[in-house]
């Protein structure tokens, strides 16, 4: 008898999980545009470069609490993010050119 009750308990848990999954599927998901994502990525790259530049200026002025290794790390992060942005742009341009060269 207890085995049947255990199986019924598992079945009821599965049904509850299925019901909650259906409820989550019915909620409208926010749409994120490609242009919006690209703009946000460019903003993050710009913010990284601005932070690195600010950190370097503070170090140059001799402000306390700004270490050289932090400045170098921030500058390297800014450089890497810029290179990543350039590579993404190159891939987008190549994809655009490929689409434009397709015959309809």
Swiss-Prot record:
The keyword Repeat does not apply. One of its GO terms (molecular function) is cytoskeletal motor activity. Belongs to the FliE family. InterPro entries: FliE. Coiled coil: none annotated. Disulfide bonds: none annotated. The keyword ATP-binding does not apply. It is found in: Bacterial flagellum basal body. GO terms for biological process: bacterial-type flagellum assembly; bacterial-type flagellum-dependent cell motility; chemotaxis. The gene is fliE. Keywords: Bacterial flagellum. This is Flagellar hook-basal body complex protein FliE. It comes from Escherichia coli (strain K12). Pfam families: FliE. GO terms for cellular component: bacterial-type flagellum; bacterial-type flagellum basal body; bacterial-type flagellum basal body, rod.
């Amino acid at each position: 008898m207890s085995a049947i009750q255990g199986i019924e308990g598992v079945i009821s848990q599965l049904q509850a999980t299925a019901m909650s999954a259906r409820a989550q599927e019915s909620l409208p998901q926010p749409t994120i545009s490609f242009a919006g994502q690209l703009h946000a990525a460019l903003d993050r790259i710009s913010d990284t470069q601005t932070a690195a530049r600010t950190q370097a200026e503070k170090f140059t002025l001799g402000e306390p609490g700004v270490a050289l290794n932090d400045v170098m790390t921030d500058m390297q992060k800014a450089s890497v993010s810029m290179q990543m942005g350039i590579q993404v742009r190159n891939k987008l341009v190549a994809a655009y050119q490929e689409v434009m060269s397709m015959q309809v």
